[in-house]
Amino acid sequence: MDIFRVLTRGASIRKNGDSNRTQSADFSMANEKKSKTAGSSSTPARDEQQLTKELDFFRNKKIMNKVKSESTKGEGEDEVQEDNQEEDEDHADDETELSGKIITKQDALKLRKSYQGNVSGNSVPLPIGSFEDLITRFQFDKRLLNNLIENNFTEPTPIQSESIPILLHERDMIACAPTGSGKTLAFLIPLLQQIINDKTTVGLKGLIISPTKELANQIFIECSKLANKIYLDKKRPLQVALLSKSLSSKLKNKVISEDKYDIIISTPLRLITVVQEEALNLGKVKHLIFDEADKLFDKTFVEQTDDILSSCTDPHLRKTMFSATIPSNVEEIAQTIMNDPIRVIIGHKEAANINIDQQLVFCGNEEGKLIAIRQLVLEGEFKPPVIIFLESITRAKALFHELLYDKLNVDVIHAERTQVQRDKIIERFKSGDLWCLICTDVLARGVDFKGVNLVINYDVPRSAQAYVHRIGRTGRGGRSGKAITFYTKQDSLAIKPIINVMKQSGCEVSEWMQKISSMSKREKESLKKGKGHVERKQISTVPKVVKQKKRQRREMIEASKKRKLSVSDAEEEAGNDST
């Protein structure tokens, strides 16, 4: 039964004779129905029933075969008979859908081939073909299922199809999937289900670690939506918390019990601080999830991550890693801290989202980058919302002031801004008040801005991983997006990993790119050591002549101050000699 056929019934008007005859027949039928109370009452009931069938995404409601009515005579009986026939067809369709479930390993191989999934490990569980499988295979909680429906999650993405059954089987896992592929939901759904099932203990059971506050806040919002109206034993609601500065203080001062929350989401340093102050005990944590794992295990966070692991002392602790990029060194670390993990790769490990149109634009020098942005605006290619990434706070500020002169609706976000300022800017950008957001890599990971049309890498990213995460702010949730990377003569080495990502993502690569994309061992080592990074000039469109005059004037003022200072010192010495 097509829902649109129900809603548009009787709205067709045609010009030929047959259609006129049909139209008049419809009107006569309508007049006849008006004289029959039973017929008029059965039609809305039938339509309502058909609508319910169409909206029953997960087939968790039993659709009645007959419309309950005290009187069904004449035409009403024909309608019920027709309805029963359509219901039989629907049930036949349902049986076809049920037969498409993942039952055998051969079914799993076909499904994985469709989305280029690579799963390895011992005793790998079968993936789910639909959310319906969660009901039949795992006795999925109805309240959690309703929250999924209310938030318009109707079909699992590839990473969700693989991750959810693995985590529900309580296995350690390393998962890599493109940006915007639904990784957050892939670990939230099984985590919530496991906490609902675990009725033995009270207190903190799930811990989610994120490298940035913005990503942690986003995970908290999504988790709160799915945990809405879910109650555990003794009518206690499932509690989710974001470890903010305020909550840390309350835990430290014992205003709030540490056993109040079932799930806590936090950045590494804040969590370690609270644990060291003995305000929070991680001994009961059974599920530890690292989102953006490659960042959490690099040299910036690895010591903090190690402290978190040592604080989680439960012998049955399950560890999970998610990211859009998983370097080999992170996988090596994972193998040492995990127990027989399953490895899930969707697509290519170092590839970007295939929905993103990636381009490289040669700008000659730093001044050429500003000209290139203004060219995009003039040609109508600068389609908001737009995110521009730079390598440093100083350069982000400088570009912000330059674009303000162009009267663009723009703002800048970086680590020097307060959390309140950052939250307000992000909210304005999401609501459409801001058209362009300039930022550093603080926003490159995880944060979900729906509908971003364009990402501009004003400065070439320092690694292929950074590039994948930056451009991953667009092309999310199945939408298309565009990413442009500016480069100069100085970036000849730094763009090689980016060209390789473009090739692996299926982008068209010109001949000159093919020639320079291959890297020697020495070049790879120099990039790892950061030698590919170049010192960049200040962002400015002020002419060189004006800059020279300003510099000369500044030097003259400084020289004048020195002369005055030396004269005053000489006068003081002369006065001392006379006395």
From Swiss-Prot:
InterPro entries attached to this UniProt entry: DDX52/Rok1_DEADc, DEAD/DEAH_box_helicase_dom, DEAD_box_RNA_helicase, Helicase_ATP-bd, Helicase_C-like, P-loop_NTPase, RNA-helicase_DEAD-box_CS, RNA_helicase_DEAD_Q_motif
Enzyme Commission designation: 3.6.4.13
Pfam families named among the record's database cross-references: DEAD, Helicase_C
GO molecular function, one term: ATP hydrolysis activity
Catalytic activity as recorded in UniProt: ATP + H2O = ADP + phosphate + H(+)
GO biological process, one term: maturation of SSU-rRNA
Positions with biased composition (Basic and acidic residues): 45-59, 520-538
Motif (Q motif): 133-161
Domain Helicase ATP-binding: 164-344
Domain-related comment: The Q motif is unique to and characteristic of the DEAD box family of RNA helicases and controls ATP binding and hydrolysis.
Assembly: Interacts with the U3 snoRNA and is associated with the 90S and 40S pre-ribosomes.
Known function: ATP-dependent RNA helicase involved in 40S ribosomal subunit biogenesis. Required for the processing and cleavage of 35S pre-rRNA at sites A0, A1, and A2, leading to mature 18S rRNA.
Protein name as catalogued: ATP-dependent RNA helicase ROK1
Species assigned in the record: Kluyveromyces lactis (strain ATCC 8585 / CBS 2359 / DSM 70799 / NBRC 1267 / NRRL Y-1140 / WM37)
Gene expressing this chain: ROK1
